[in-house]
């Protein structure tokens, strides 16, 4: 065919595609006008579809690498989008956060958009807990694309599995109905495990990618430009992701995956996003780069500048692990977390963790102190130790309250090759008076020699009661248990009962200690229970619930 005729043929094909798109838009608007109701999953994007979470919306190679411009420049050199269209990002010109991957082939570019439309439909049906039918899929992408449906569905399935960890499965062979199933172990090991429910966590990896490609900090305008490409707009509730501003500035910030802060020297004030500490802890720049590369059907080396940065990040992490605190086998890890919740006033909290490793003998101590002169406090401290030998753990929580309600919780968990576990919890709630509660659990394991100690002290200024319970077990294959209860009451009558049961059979031992306090005038109850069982497999738990109908006090 002569060159001129080829050009005319290409022009006719391009005009036909544009006419098809325009016809789809008119059909969708006509249907919406006739029905007069909110669109469903099958017609919401029939004509005015956005890219959703297709590859067209994800960050791609940066301008600095000699590729097509995709990521927004940090300041004045940013690419700008055409604002002529009011229908959404679909009709915008090429921008820094979006470049049509098949711009040289209108047919492939159209299939990419259809993939995004089908993805949004499938996610919508998943959220509604309804199966997706092949007939509705054809309505979404237009029946003209019936022959291309298998290819479009395959691409949409790959993207959904990559981003959300959801697999598209046919309910019955050749049945024409599909559903999304969560994959507990996605083939891509890049996904983050968050406490956020689906689908909020689906945006996390792409957002971290945008921040990474923008010099490890992205302005709020750049983030919204990227989200707009996905059909997510500020102030508009998204059918899949809900309220987007709350998601990125509150939920992901609260989970410590993102940092949302004011840009330095900005006037008027503007804000930016950075990786949060949890993002640095749970993923790496290389994993994010691998994610972006897979989305764009390329390799991490296609981002040379960022690939070099990701390699440096890997080296720095390896050096930090080698020089820092021990982390494997006989080397131990300790983590202390303190969480304070305050809606109206100021708190003070201090958490300390000490690790000593000498011949695989480990010690860890966590302390939390709360001081509140006038309001309500919450504090939580958690310490976890793990290796392969002997462990000791102590957790102490002192509470001081001058006038109001306090809550403190301390939890210690030990795990090693002898399968030892020790757990201590302290909860204190005071509605009318000053209380103090202390619980200690110490566990030492050396060739089936075990010791467990539980101690509870209660102090009530109105009734002046004290109760102590102590249980000690020791010596290989021979066990002794002692329980002591001491009551001191200057103003009211108290009753105390202590029971100890021992069962010994081939190193399988159980010891139980119960302490009950009954005060007719104050109505207090305290119970302590310690259980040990199975040879070389030990568990010790100490629980002390206290109920005071006058003071409403509980201590465990």
Swiss-Prot record:
Region described as 15 X 15 AA approximate tandem repeats: 334-554
Biased composition (Basic residues): 1-15, 77-87
Tissue specificity comment: Expressed in testis (at protein level).
GO cellular component: cytoplasm
A Pfam family this chain is assigned to: MAGE_N
Locations listed in the record: Cytoplasm
Primary residence: cytoplasm
Location of the MAGE domain: 111-310
Keyword Plastid among record annotations: no
Nucleus among keywords: no
InterPro entries: MAGE (IPR037445), MAGE_N (IPR021072), MAGE_WH1 (IPR041898), MAGE_WH2 (IPR041899), MHD_dom (IPR002190)
Superkingdom in the source lineage: Eukaryota
Keywords assigned by UniProt, alphabetized: Cytoplasm, Phosphoprotein, Repeat, Tumor antigen
Residues carrying Phosphoserine: 325
Regions of compositional bias (Polar residues) in chain numbering: 39-73
Ranges for region Disordered: 1-110, 315-335
PROSITE patterns: MAGE
Sequence repeat ranges, renumbered to this chain: 334-348, 349-363, 364-378, 379-392, 393-407, 408-421, 422-436, 437-451, 452-466, 467-480, 481-495, 496-510, 511-525, 526-539, 540-554
Protein name (database record): Melanoma-associated antigen B4
Organism name: Mus musculus
Upper classification of the organism: Eukaryota, Metazoa, Chordata, Craniata, Vertebrata
């Amino acid at each position: 065919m002569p060159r001129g005729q080829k050009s005319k043929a290409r022009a006719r094909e391009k005009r036909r595609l544009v006419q098809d798109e325009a016809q789809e838009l008119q059909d969708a608007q006509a249907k919406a006008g006739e029905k007069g109701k909110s669109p469903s999953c099958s017609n919401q994007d029939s004509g005015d579809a956005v890219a959703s979470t297709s590859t067209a919306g994800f960050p791609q190679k940066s301008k600095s690498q000699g590729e097509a411009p995709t990521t927004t420049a940090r300041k004045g050199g940013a690419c700008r989008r055409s604002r002529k269209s009011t229908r959404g990002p679909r009709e915008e010109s090429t921008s820094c956060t979006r470049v049509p991957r098949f711009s040289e082939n209108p047919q492939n570019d159209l299939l990419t958009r259809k993939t995004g439309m089908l993805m949004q439909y499938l996610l919508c049906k998943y959220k509604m807990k309804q199966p997706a039918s092949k007939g509705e899929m054809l309505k979404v992408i237009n029946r003209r694309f019936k022959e291309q449906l298998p290819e479009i569905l395959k691409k949409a399935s790959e993207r959904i599995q990559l981003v959300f960890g959801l697999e598209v499965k046919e309910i019955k062979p050749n049945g024409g109905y599909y559903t999304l199933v969560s994959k507990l172990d996605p083939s891509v090991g890049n996904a983050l495990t968050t406490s956020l429910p689906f689908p909020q966590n689906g945006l996390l990896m792409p957002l971290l990618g945008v921040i990474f490609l923008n010099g490890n900090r992205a302005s709020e305008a750049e983030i919204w430009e990227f989200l707009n490409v996905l059909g997510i707009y500020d102030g508009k509730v998204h059918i899949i992701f809900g309220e987007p501003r709350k998601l990125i500035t509150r939920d992901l910030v609260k989970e410590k995956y993102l940092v949302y802060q004011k840009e330095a020297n900005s006037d008027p004030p503007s804000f930016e996003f950075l990786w949060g500490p949890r993002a640095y802890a749970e993923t790496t720049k290389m994993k994010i780069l691998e994610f972006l590369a897979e989305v764009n059907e390329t390799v991490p080396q296609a981002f040379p500048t960022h690939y070099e940065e990701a390699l440096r990040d890997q080296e720095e992490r390896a050096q930090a692990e080698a020089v820092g605190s021990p982390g494997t086998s006989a080397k131990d890890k300790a983590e202390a977390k303190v969480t304070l919740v305050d809606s109206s006033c100021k708190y003070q909290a201090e958490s300390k963790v000490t690790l000593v490793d000498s011949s695989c003998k480990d010690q860890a101590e966590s302390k939390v102190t709360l001081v509140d002169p006038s309001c309500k406090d919450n504090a939580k401290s958690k310490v976890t130790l793990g290796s392969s030998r002997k462990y000791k753990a102590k957790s102490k929580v002192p509470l001081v309250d001058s006038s109001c309600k306090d809550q403190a919780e301390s939890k210690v968990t030990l795990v090693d090759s002898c399968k030892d576990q020790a757990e201590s919890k302290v909860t204190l709630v005071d509605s009318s008076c000053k209380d103090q509660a202390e619980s200690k659990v110490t566990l030492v394991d050396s060739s089936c020699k075990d010791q467990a100690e539980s101690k509870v002290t209660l102090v009530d200024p109105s009734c002046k009661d004290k109760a102590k319970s102590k249980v000690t077990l020791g010596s290989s294959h021979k066990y002794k248990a002692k329980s002591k209860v001491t009551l001191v009451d200057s103003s009211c009558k108290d009753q105390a009962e202590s029971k100890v049961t021992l069962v010994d059979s081939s190193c399988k031992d159980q010891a139980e200690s119960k302490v009950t306090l009954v005060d007719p005038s104050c109505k207090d109850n305290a119970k302590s229970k310690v259980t040990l069982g199975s040879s070389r497999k030990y568990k010790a738990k100490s629980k002390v619930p206290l109920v005071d109908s006058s003071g409403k006090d509980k201590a465990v």
